[in-house]
Protein backbone atom coordinates (compact mmCIF):
# COMPACT_ATOMS: atom_id res chain seq x y z
CA UNK A 1 0.00 0.00 0.00
CA UNK A 2 1.41 3.39 -1.05
CA UNK A 3 1.97 5.92 1.74
CA UNK A 4 0.04 9.12 1.00
CA UNK A 5 0.14 11.12 4.22
CA UNK A 6 2.91 13.69 3.81
CA UNK A 7 3.76 16.82 5.76
CA UNK A 8 2.55 19.71 3.62
CA UNK A 9 0.78 23.04 3.88
CA UNK A 10 -2.93 22.46 4.46
CA UNK A 11 -2.56 18.95 5.93
CA UNK A 12 -4.90 18.35 8.88
CA UNK A 13 -3.26 16.64 11.87
CA UNK A 14 -4.54 15.05 15.09
CA UNK A 15 -2.76 16.02 18.33
CA UNK A 16 -2.09 12.79 20.23
CA UNK A 17 -0.64 14.23 23.46
CA UNK A 18 0.12 17.54 25.11
CA UNK A 19 -2.05 20.40 26.36
CA UNK A 20 -4.24 20.25 23.21
CA UNK A 21 -4.53 16.45 23.02
CA UNK A 22 -7.53 15.16 21.07
CA UNK A 23 -7.92 18.24 18.84
CA UNK A 24 -7.39 18.83 15.13
CA UNK A 25 -5.06 21.43 13.60
CA UNK A 26 -4.00 22.43 10.11
CA UNK A 27 -0.34 22.82 9.11
CA UNK A 28 0.17 26.41 7.97
CA UNK A 29 3.94 26.33 7.48
CA UNK A 30 6.90 23.99 7.99
CA UNK A 31 9.56 25.50 10.26
CA UNK A 32 12.18 22.73 10.12
CA UNK A 33 12.42 18.94 10.14
CA UNK A 34 11.10 18.76 13.71
CA UNK A 35 8.48 21.51 13.99
CA UNK A 36 5.60 23.05 12.06
CA UNK A 37 3.42 26.13 12.40
CA UNK A 38 -0.13 24.94 13.05
CA UNK A 39 -3.50 26.61 13.49
CA UNK A 40 -6.88 25.31 14.64
CA UNK A 41 -9.45 28.10 14.28
CA UNK A 42 -12.44 25.75 14.63
CA UNK A 43 -10.96 23.62 17.43
CA UNK A 44 -9.81 26.46 19.73
CA UNK A 45 -6.10 25.94 19.14
CA UNK A 46 -4.23 29.19 18.61
CA UNK A 47 -1.49 29.48 16.00
CA UNK A 48 1.78 28.14 17.41
CA UNK A 49 4.86 26.03 16.65
CA UNK A 50 4.33 22.35 17.41
CA UNK A 51 6.69 19.35 17.12
CA UNK A 52 5.82 16.58 14.68
CA UNK A 53 6.19 13.89 17.36
CA UNK A 54 2.92 14.95 19.04
CA UNK A 55 0.96 15.09 15.75
CA UNK A 56 -0.59 12.32 13.67
CA UNK A 57 -1.35 13.15 10.04
CA UNK A 58 -4.86 12.52 8.68
CA UNK A 59 -6.18 12.08 5.14
CA UNK A 60 -7.74 15.57 5.00
CA UNK A 61 -6.07 18.44 3.13
CA UNK A 62 -7.22 22.07 3.08
CA UNK A 63 -6.55 24.43 0.21
CA UNK A 64 -5.12 27.77 1.33
CA UNK A 65 -1.92 29.67 0.44
CA UNK A 66 1.39 29.38 2.23
CA UNK A 67 1.41 31.12 5.67
CA UNK A 68 -2.24 32.16 5.22
CA UNK A 69 -3.98 34.21 7.85
CA UNK A 70 -6.44 32.69 10.30
CA UNK A 71 -9.59 33.84 8.51
CA UNK A 72 -8.55 32.01 5.32
CA UNK A 73 -7.79 28.86 7.29
CA UNK A 74 -11.18 29.09 9.01
CA UNK A 75 -12.97 29.60 5.69
CA UNK A 76 -11.26 26.58 4.11
CA UNK A 77 -11.97 24.49 7.24
CA UNK A 78 -15.69 25.28 7.24
CA UNK A 79 -15.96 24.80 3.48
CA UNK A 80 -14.44 21.31 3.68
CA UNK A 81 -16.59 20.48 6.76
CA UNK A 82 -13.65 18.84 8.50
CA UNK A 83 -15.34 18.35 11.89
CA UNK A 84 -18.22 16.31 10.43
CA UNK A 85 -15.93 14.23 8.22
CA UNK A 86 -13.59 13.54 11.12
CA UNK A 87 -16.45 12.40 13.38
CA UNK A 88 -17.52 9.88 10.70
CA UNK A 89 -14.09 8.21 10.45
CA UNK A 90 -13.21 4.92 12.16
CA UNK A 91 -10.31 6.65 13.86
CA UNK A 92 -12.57 9.12 15.67
CA UNK A 93 -15.11 6.39 16.53
CA UNK A 94 -12.39 4.24 18.13
CA UNK A 95 -11.17 7.18 20.21
CA UNK A 96 -14.74 7.94 21.33
CA UNK A 97 -15.37 4.28 22.20
CA UNK A 98 -12.14 4.14 24.21
CA UNK A 99 -13.15 7.23 26.19
CA UNK A 100 -16.65 5.91 26.87
CA UNK A 101 -15.26 2.54 27.98
CA UNK A 102 -12.90 4.25 30.42
CA UNK A 103 -15.88 6.06 32.01
CA UNK A 104 -18.03 2.92 32.40
CA UNK A 105 -19.06 1.64 35.83
CA UNK A 106 -19.36 -1.98 36.97
CA UNK A 107 -23.10 -1.98 36.29
CA UNK A 108 -22.53 -0.62 32.76
CA UNK A 109 -20.02 -3.39 32.07
CA UNK A 110 -22.53 -5.96 33.39
CA UNK A 111 -25.23 -4.64 31.03
CA UNK A 112 -22.81 -4.81 28.10
CA UNK A 113 -21.96 -8.42 28.97
CA UNK A 114 -25.65 -9.42 29.09
CA UNK A 115 -26.32 -7.67 25.77
CA UNK A 116 -23.41 -9.50 24.13
CA UNK A 117 -24.67 -12.86 25.41
CA UNK A 118 -28.15 -12.16 24.04
CA UNK A 119 -26.72 -11.09 20.69
CA UNK A 120 -24.58 -14.25 20.44
CA UNK A 121 -27.57 -16.44 21.28
CA UNK A 122 -29.70 -14.82 18.57
CA UNK A 123 -26.91 -15.17 16.01
CA UNK A 124 -26.40 -18.84 16.90
CA UNK A 125 -30.10 -19.69 16.51
CA UNK A 126 -30.31 -17.91 13.15
CA UNK A 127 -27.19 -19.71 11.88
CA UNK A 128 -28.67 -23.06 12.91
CA UNK A 129 -31.89 -22.24 11.06
CA UNK A 130 -29.96 -21.35 7.90
CA UNK A 131 -27.86 -24.51 8.14
CA UNK A 132 -30.98 -26.64 8.57
CA UNK A 133 -32.65 -24.97 5.59
CA UNK A 134 -29.56 -25.50 3.44
CA UNK A 135 -29.41 -29.17 4.49
CA UNK A 136 -33.07 -29.72 3.64
CA UNK A 137 -32.58 -28.07 0.28
CA UNK A 138 -29.42 -30.01 -0.57
CA UNK A 139 -30.66 -33.63 -0.53
CA UNK A 140 -34.02 -35.22 0.33
CA UNK A 141 -32.39 -38.21 2.09
CA UNK A 142 -30.47 -36.01 4.47
CA UNK A 143 -33.60 -33.94 4.92
CA UNK A 144 -35.56 -37.00 6.08
CA UNK A 145 -32.77 -38.02 8.47
CA UNK A 146 -32.59 -34.49 9.87
CA UNK A 147 -36.36 -34.36 10.37
CA UNK A 148 -36.29 -37.69 12.20
CA UNK A 149 -33.45 -36.50 14.43
CA UNK A 150 -35.32 -33.28 15.24
CA UNK A 151 -38.50 -35.21 16.06
CA UNK A 152 -36.59 -37.65 18.29
CA UNK A 153 -34.90 -34.82 20.14
CA UNK A 154 -38.24 -33.07 20.68
CA UNK A 155 -39.85 -36.29 21.95
CA UNK A 156 -36.96 -36.95 24.33
CA UNK A 157 -37.20 -33.43 25.63
CA UNK A 158 -40.96 -33.66 26.16
CA UNK A 159 -40.74 -37.06 27.89
CA UNK A 160 -39.76 -36.22 31.45
CA UNK A 161 -39.68 -39.11 34.02
CA UNK A 162 -42.35 -38.66 36.70
CA UNK A 163 -40.88 -38.46 40.21
CA UNK A 164 -42.55 -40.31 43.09
CA UNK A 165 -44.33 -37.94 45.39
CA UNK A 166 -43.10 -38.13 48.98
CA UNK A 167 -45.45 -35.87 50.89
CA UNK A 168 -45.96 -36.05 54.66
CA UNK A 169 -49.36 -37.79 54.33
CA UNK A 170 -47.98 -40.43 51.98
CA UNK A 171 -45.00 -41.04 54.27
CA UNK A 172 -47.36 -41.66 57.23
CA UNK A 173 -49.49 -44.08 55.16
CA UNK A 174 -46.40 -46.03 54.10
CA UNK A 175 -45.19 -46.31 57.70
CA UNK A 176 -48.64 -47.52 58.85
CA UNK A 177 -48.75 -50.18 56.13
CA UNK A 178 -45.29 -51.47 57.06
CA UNK A 179 -46.32 -51.65 60.77
CA UNK A 180 -49.46 -53.65 59.91
CA UNK A 181 -47.43 -56.02 57.79
CA UNK A 182 -44.97 -56.59 60.60
CA UNK A 183 -47.80 -57.29 63.10
CA UNK A 184 -49.47 -59.81 60.78
CA UNK A 185 -46.38 -61.94 60.49
CA UNK A 186 -46.44 -64.97 62.87
CA UNK A 187 -43.54 -65.71 65.11
CA UNK A 188 -41.54 -68.75 64.09
CA UNK A 189 -42.49 -71.87 66.21
CA UNK A 190 -39.82 -73.15 68.55
CA UNK A 191 -37.83 -76.17 67.42
CA UNK A 192 -39.37 -79.48 68.59
CA UNK A 193 -37.35 -82.44 69.71
CA UNK A 194 -37.31 -85.71 67.76
CA UNK A 195 -40.17 -88.19 68.34
CA UNK A 196 -39.45 -91.19 70.72
CA UNK A 197 -36.61 -89.42 72.42
CA UNK A 198 -37.01 -88.77 76.10
CA UNK A 199 -35.07 -86.47 78.18
CA UNK A 200 -32.80 -88.39 80.57
CA UNK A 201 -34.03 -88.26 84.20
CA UNK A 202 -31.50 -87.32 86.80
CA UNK A 203 -31.13 -89.86 89.64
CA UNK A 204 -31.19 -88.64 93.21
CA UNK A 205 -28.05 -89.44 95.20
CA UNK A 206 -28.40 -92.53 97.59
CA UNK A 207 -28.58 -91.77 101.32
CA UNK A 208 -25.50 -92.66 103.36
CA UNK A 209 -25.67 -95.65 105.79
CA UNK A 210 -26.14 -94.80 109.42
CA UNK A 211 -23.47 -97.14 110.74
CA UNK A 212 -20.92 -99.77 109.68
CA UNK A 213 -21.52 -103.47 110.22
CA UNK A 214 -19.48 -105.11 112.94
UniProtKB/Swiss-Prot annotation:
Modified residues (Phosphoserine): 139
Positions of modified residues (N6-acetyllysine): 79, 85
Chain's gene name: Rpl14
Keywords, ordered alphabetically: Acetylation, Cytoplasm, Isopeptide bond, Phosphoprotein, Repeat, Ribonucleoprotein, Ribosomal protein, Ubl conjugation
Ranges for the Sequence repeats: 170-174, 175-179, 180-184, 185-189, 192-194, 195-197
PANTHER family: 60S RIBOSOMAL PROTEIN L14, LARGE RIBOSOMAL SUBUNIT PROTEIN EL14
Region (4 X 5 AA tandem repeats of Q-K-A-[AS]-X): 170-189
Stretches the record annotates as Disordered: 158-214
Species in which this protein is naturally found: Rattus norvegicus (Rat)
Function summary: Component of the large ribosomal subunit. The ribosome is a large ribonucleoprotein complex responsible for the synthesis of proteins in the cell.
Subunit: Component of the large ribosomal subunit.
Record location of the Glycyl lysine isopeptide (Lys-Gly) (interchain with G-Cter in SUMO2) cross-link: 124
Family named by the database record: Belongs to the eukaryotic ribosomal protein eL14 family.
MF term (GO), any: RNA binding
Region of interest: 2 X 3 AA tandem repeats of K-G-Q: 192-197
GO cellular component terms listed in the entry, alphabetical order: cytoplasm; cytosolic large ribosomal subunit; cytosolic ribosome; postsynaptic density; synapse
GO BP annotations, alphabetical order: ribosomal large subunit biogenesis; rRNA processing; translation
Protein known as: Large ribosomal subunit protein eL14
Cellular compartments annotated: Cytoplasm
Amino acid sequence: MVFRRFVEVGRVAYISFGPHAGKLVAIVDVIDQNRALVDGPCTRVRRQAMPFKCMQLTDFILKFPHSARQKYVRKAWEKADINTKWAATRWAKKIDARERKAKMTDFDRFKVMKAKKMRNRIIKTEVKKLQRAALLKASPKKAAVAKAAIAAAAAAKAKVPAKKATGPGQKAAAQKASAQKAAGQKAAPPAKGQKGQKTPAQKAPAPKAAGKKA
